[in-house]
Amino acid sequence: MDFLVYINRLLLGLVFSIFFGSGATLAGVEEDYAIAKQSFDSGDYKTAMAAWAPLAEEGHSRSQVMLGYAYKNGMGVVKNNKTSFRWYAKAAAQGDSYAQFKVGSAYTNGEVVLGNNQTAVKWFNLAAKQGFGNAQYMLAVNYYNGRGVGKDYKRAYMWCTLALHNGTRLASNIKGQIVKRLLSYHPKDGWHDESAALSEAQEMARVCLASNYQTC
């Protein structure tokens, strides 16, 4: 899931928030956010930033995400990775899946913060359980390589399958490698049906999706 897809989904939720939300205050904040988004989309980044900044300071998570994105890319403000991370971290703490993915990525790459694969996995897991495909892909990579978690090809397959389900095409690059590993899997306690591990991984993916990612 890329940033534009994420934003479009949020805007769909915004419509429901305004019409079915809890009062005029919510509608006013969301309206201000939407107007700023229109400015941003038209290339007037400074106007958008001026509108989002007070909303973000008041704790509006989507505005915090947009500030994180703008500071990361130098759109309407001077590029500043530290400030970008700070805003992403604030939104991530409020449960925003895109922000959680970005925080996890920062810990993976050692950008702004010290690299820490275990912390990265924690944030990817939070985003993945909200159906965020890129985070699901990163979990697949981490389980495949045993980075921040124990190496687990079944869980790597599960998250890779779910990432593809949610439109993260990049996951197709490693799915074949994971399947190859599963088909050659033999536990230490003796002979094992070569197709059993793959079947188990497929069932894990099915159950995870059916539970809306809550039993993964």
Residue ranges and their predicted role:
Residues A171-C216:
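Terminal, low-structured helical/coil segments at or just beyond the last alpha-helical repeat
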Residues P54-L55, K90-A91, L126-A127, A163:
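Canonical positions in the second alpha-helix
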Residues D2-L12:
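Bacterial N-terminal signal peptides that target proteins for export
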Residues L11-S22:
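Bacterial N-terminal signal peptides
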Residues D32-S39, A51-L55, M66-N73, K102-N109, ...:
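Hydrophobic face of amphipathic alpha-helices that form TPR/SEL1-like repeat modules
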Residues S39-G43, E57-S61, N73-M75, N80, ...:
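Short helix-capping/linker turns of helical repeat alpha-solenoids
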